[in-house]
């Protein structure tokens, strides 16, 4: 089967998940990937006989001081689309894919270009991501408390992103009731290096900061009493830089995974991918969601509710100390978590592809629910 696979390029979580799925798909199918941002370079390395990777333009999110800057995000995206050739580049890619590949089914990891291609050519779409949980599941009001407006905005955007798909596969470590049809929940997709990692409890914190605009973080970490191995805050490093208890490290996938599997706990944002990996390896996590990013708030609050760590919507010395003091409690909570690799989602994806092939896109969503 010829598969068009769209991957959103904001952040690396979607690309890491897609890499695992693509490695499985190319065993039986020919796949054309369309992807934007840094994710393109990551996935392009995997191109081969049955996998082609094409770069498109995609939106970006601007953050400062651990908060999404809505106006600057708007300006950056208008500039990218109109002044830097983003939309013309995407139109060119559209006709290239139409001429040379002729897909039979489309898979979208929260990516719009591939979805619009499917709509225009009456192709079935399968959604694979973690975001649709906000739209297609019933969330406990306690999880949205204080962020009801952000929840409704996020829900509306996500609902409009890939409407009317043949099936929605949602990757998650928490399981709210499903409220819409054609929707299934599955454990997180994990890269093989994580599945092969053997967790050992060391005496350091792993700190991962995607955005470099959180100037207060280093001073707080110095008060932790633990060695902190930090990735992301100093991106130009070629070798580790030591500042007291803080060890800033250049990014290395192997080094990062080793620090993750041996850490006492993780301090990071509310992004889903690392959170899922930490849960799988039974590593407690202090999740600091980016402000105004409801998906991260939901992830962090759900993590705390499950007993796997803490949510810190504002990171303070007291909250960090509480996290460290409760590490044994979180370790106990995590001890009961288990999943059978990636089998669950991958089997359902193949089943959904075979069922959807040749059926055309659905006319609309389940009319019984908003």
Specify the residue positions occupied by each region the protein language model found.
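Conserved nucleotide-sugar phosphate-binding/catalytic loop shared by glycosyltransferases and other
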Residues: 9, 32-85
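Short N-terminal targeting/anchoring amphipathic segment
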Residues: 95-111
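Nucleotide-sugar donor-binding patch of glycosyltransferase catalytic domains
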Residues: 241, 250-251, 284-330
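A donor-sugar binding/catalytic signature common to diverse glycosyltransferases
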Residues: 105-109, 259-298
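Active-site-proximal region of nucleotide-activated glycan assembly enzymes
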Residues: 124-185
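C-terminal amphipathic helix plus adjacent low-complexity
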Residues: 322-370
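Donor-nucleotide binding loops and adjacent catalytic segments primarily
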Residues: 22, 189-265
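A short, glycine/small-residue-rich beta-strand->loop->alpha-helix junction that serves as a flexible
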Residues: 6-19
């Amino acid at each position: 089967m010829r598969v068009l696979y769209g991957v959103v390029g904001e952040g690396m979580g979607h690309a890491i998940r897609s890499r695992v799925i693509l490695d499985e798909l190319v065993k039986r199918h020919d796949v054309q990937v369309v992807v934007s941002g840094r994710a393109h370079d990551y996935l392009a390395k995997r191109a081969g006989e049955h996998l082609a990777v094409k770069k498109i333009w995609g939106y970006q999110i601007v953050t400062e001081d651990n908060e999404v800057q809505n106006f600057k995000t708007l300006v950056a995206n208008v500039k990218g689309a109109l002044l830097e050739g983003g939309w013309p580049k995407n139109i060119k890619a559209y006709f290239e894919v139409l001429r040379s590949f002729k897909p039979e089914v489309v898979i979208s990891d929260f990516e719009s270009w591939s979805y619009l291609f499917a709509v225009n050519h009456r192709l079935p779409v399968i959604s694979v991501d973690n975001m649709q949980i906000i739209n297609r599941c019933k969330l406990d009001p306690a999880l949205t408390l204080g962020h009801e407006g952000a929840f409704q905005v996020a829900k509306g955007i996500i609902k409009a992103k890939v409407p009317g798909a043949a099936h929605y596969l949602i990757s998650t470590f928490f399981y709210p009731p499903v409220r819409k049809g054609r929707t299934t929940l599955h454990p997180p997709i994990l890269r093989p290096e994580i599945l092969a990692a053997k967790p050992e409890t060391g005496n350091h914190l792993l700190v991962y900061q995607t955005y470099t605009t959180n100037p207060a973080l280093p001073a707080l970490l110095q008060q932790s009493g633990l060695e902190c191995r930090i990735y992301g805050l100093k991106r130009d490093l070629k070798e580790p830089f030591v500042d007291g208890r803080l060890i800033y490290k250049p990014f290395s996938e192997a080094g990062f995974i080793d620090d993750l599997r041996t850490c006492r706990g993780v301090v990071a944002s509310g992004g889903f991918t690392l959170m899922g990996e930490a849960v799988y390896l039974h590593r407690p996590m202090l999740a600091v969601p980016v402000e105004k990013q409801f998906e991260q708030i939901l992830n962090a609050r759900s993590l705390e509710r499950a007993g796997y760590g803490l949510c810190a919507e504002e990171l303070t010395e007291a909250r960090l100390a509480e996290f460290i003091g409760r590490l044994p409690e979180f370790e106990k909570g995590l001890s009961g978590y288990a999943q059978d690799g990636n089998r669950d989602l991958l089997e359902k994806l193949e089943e959904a592809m075979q069922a959807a092939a040749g059926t055309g896109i659905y006319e609309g969503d389940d009319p019984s629910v908003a």
